[in-house]
Amino acid sequence: MKLGKVEFCHFLQLIALFLCFSGMSQAELSRSRSKPYFQSGRSRTKRSWVWNQFFVLEEYMGSDPLYVGKLHSDVDKGDGSIKYILSGEGASSIFIIDENTGDIHATKRLDREEQAYYTLRAQALDRLTNKPVEPESEFVIKIQDINDNEPKFLDGPYTAGVPEMSPVGTSVVQVTATDADDPTYGNSARVVYSILQGQPYFSVEPKTGVIKTALPNMDREAKDQYLLVIQAKDMVGQNGGLSGTTSVTVTLTDVNDNPPRFPRRSYQYNVPESLPVASVVARIKAADADIGANAEMEYKIVDGDGLGIFKISVDKETQEGIITIQKELDFEAKTSYTLRIEAANKDADPRFLSLGPFSDTTTVKIIVEDVDEPPVFSSPLYPMEVSEATQVGNIIGTVAAHDPDSSNSPVRYSIDRNTDLERYFNIDANSGVITTAKSLDRETNAIHNITVLAMESQNPSQVGRGYVAITILDINDNAPEFAMDYETTVCENAQPGQVIQKISAVDKDEPSNGHQFYFSLTTDATNNHNFSLKDNKDNTASILTRRNGFRRQEQSVYYLPIFIVDSGSPSLSSTNTLTIRVCDCDADGVAQTCNAEAYVLPAGLSTGALIAILACVLTLLVLILLIVTMRRRKKEPLIFDEERDIRENIVRYDDEGGGEEDTEAFDMAALRNLNVIRDTKTRRDVTPEIQFLSRPAFKSIPDNVIFREFIWERLKEADVDPGAPPYDSLQTYAFEGNGSVAESLSSLDSISSNSDQNYDYLSDWGPRFKRLADMYGTGQESLYS
């Protein structure tokens, strides 16, 4: 017969009660009180409480209140005169007392894990007087534990790690289960551990919960993780005990127990010879089953003919060996290289050296492929020299380039004109001879840096570049001149022999031995009585006065011509003029005032020449002003003089209609007399938008005013006339002269069907008027009807 959990708990309760009551010596204890109790004021009687030791089983599930124990006083005679009351923790709510008998019962289910004991107070009262017959006494009701809580792993699930290849018995992790039952009573809280899943790899200590390895040489590379299930069971693991489980994930951590190995014994790679230095040729990798730091590699080239051409480094992320170029490759020099490369772990574990050497080697063969390379010059830079006096077409030097490929294609030369914009030089396309194409000037450009292009004849896209530095050698082709525009002063009170100016010269040429200049006065100025020149022999000269008594009123400016010769071969010379102004000076020789009248020494311009130049300049200015004035002159407005008549003249005017053929003279008096044109013709069936005021009488006014008034009147008539042009209508004009024989061709005349005009005569005027005759001749009337 199987018992359920509830029945099993009741069974345990009965056993516990039996043990409790059998262990008591008749279960009742008497306690004498030394405290006296007074009755009726004078007599003293000793009283004492008597009660059971109270124990209550937890988790009582019965329908009736659970009997706890009985309170009894020596005073109680059993006649009902004593009343018992209960106070303290759980009184009335959990625990009740029979006031007549003193029996205590529990009315609710108790849980020791919530509260292990209750402290209460009991008192016996006289039922009639309701006064205490015994002092209040405190007692404890202890909750008796039963095995109603299973062990629990409060820290689970667990994760742990252990190095692979660990020996048997290596500690992995400790698990701990707790049981809420009373550890001081029975075996309800005594837990033992066992492993339900994870054997035969791991084991667990039953009492401590320490998990250990159970198999040797567990290999992470074969299996790196294990899931264990650990059980904790109370009642020392006996049947009927409660249990709890947890999971433990054990990861094998890596150790360096696998040496690196290349997947292949040899590798081969093809690279073009044009691959730049530092380019990657190949990547190789030695396999290592380990991970992390145990798989870190070191690569090196241990042998081969490419030790100085290639190098190998390691990629920290992928642990690959990277082979790169250290020097330029040349197919024509060497077509292949062989490298012996070793890979080794950075840190080897001495415990596993017996597994073999923790390094491996492989062979890498690198094949250099030929590419079509541009021509190569024999020198990276060609320095050349040429005199600036050399003739056009002279040879300066020669450059040479060749095709480095095995085909050795012929080379053609040219100059990169971006480096020779002025085209000073030419080059022979076949020989590479450089010649001058223009005259050279060192003072303009002393060094020409040009780029020569060399192209293969068979493949012009392959271009090599050579650099030529042409230095222009100097010749004496520039005359010396003043270092600056000199202008000095001489005081009126200057003494003879006084130095008034020190001059120097410059020369654009650069002789190898330096400049040497010679100064003197020109032949015309040598015999002047005012100034002299002293050559200081150090490329300078001093100007001195020959006399005293200079007067500004007599001569305010002197022009002294100075002759300068250089030391070149052949030597060159120039004449430069020094301006000397006569000034009024103070006592210290500082100039105060000077004027600008000039007295020219024999070597300068004459006074007559200066006057002639000034006259020419003045005449030119007058002509320019006259031209500007003529161009800016505006036309005067047209004003008719009353005494002037324009008859017998052709008058040009604008007309929006057809032109008038009548050029016969007419009388201006008709226009001047405005009385004949004052009747404003307005349409009676249309109310004009502009109401005209009464016009005053007109006086005699100028002709231009007459024309303006006439046009203004006609403009107002047109503004108020809805039938005004662009519609054809009859217009009234002032007298314009007598009619011509050919009659008028004005477009303003009516060509309606009511017109009596006849244009048949136009056909008699010849072919020039044929088109006009077709438009206005016979038969046209129907077109306009």
UniProtKB/Swiss-Prot annotation:
A GO biological process held by the record: cell morphogenesis
PANTHER family, A to Z: CADHERIN-23, CADHERIN-7
Subcellular location as annotated: Cell membrane
Limits of the Cadherin domain: 49-153, 154-262, 263-377, 378-482, 482-599
Glycosylation sites: N449, N530
Residue numbers on the Cytoplasmic membrane side: 629-785
UniProt key word Signal: yes
This protein's domain notes: Three calcium ions are usually bound at the interface of each cadherin domain and rigidify the connections, imparting a strong curvature to the full-length ectodomain.
Keywords, ordered alphabetically: Calcium, Cell adhesion, Cell membrane, Cleavage on pair of basic residues, Glycoprotein, Membrane, Metal-binding, Repeat, Signal, Transmembrane, Transmembrane helix
UniProt-recorded Gene Ontology molecular function terms: beta-catenin binding; cadherin binding; calcium ion binding
Function, as annotated: Cadherins are calcium-dependent cell adhesion proteins. They preferentially interact with themselves in a homophilic manner in connecting cells; cadherins may thus contribute to the sorting of heterogeneous cell types.
Transmembrane parts of this sequence: 608-628
Name this polypeptide is given: Cadherin-7
Spans within the Extracellular topological domain: 28-607
Organism: Homo sapiens (Human)
